[in-house]
């Protein structure tokens, strides 16, 4: 490489980093704080059971990492802001789509947290890991399911999403999606072949979560029907021996009770 060419490349990189600095200085980029799956509502209990370590340590990010480079940190910030052009330029300049900060937060997780679907697509195409977890056991795939981002879940499924991956409560993507009544996400996950009767650390299946933590509205009725159609066990009870049918009856969810009784739920 000639000296003028090397100087031109350095100038281009300096301009790129300068642009990032201006954006950050102007307060345009999203803060790194974000929602997680850590706070899960637990019916009838003031304090949920302590979380167990993730079952898939290969994709579990440690609580702290060695300091990441400026390009990688700027990539996370740009992904949070949804700046597609800047994300592409940072990747071209050498930023890693797989890097994570000291909290285990990757650029892809930041994109999912801020609903930046196109940025997430770019990062996945660049090799971002959809199963990489942060210190709270949130992964891009699990968070997309929990927040009802069907397009994001669809992308993750085509880029190696692990259907057996679990959150801090050992809940699968199907469980967290059912808890929130995210019908389209539930459809996608069931079609992909996710286990329908997986039991989390609270002793609940996706069906139990939809009944116990839902509000009995149409979207939860649809969720329950989808789970039953996929073969969910209507008589798989919680730790106290209470079945989904009994939970639905106690809450006055008449339509759900009928659905469950049609498959011999009791």
What does each model-found stretch correspond to?
Residues 83-91, 116-124, 149-157, 182-190, ...:
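Ankyrin repeat structural motif
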Residues 3-20:
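N-terminal secretory signal peptides and thylakoid transit peptides that target proteins
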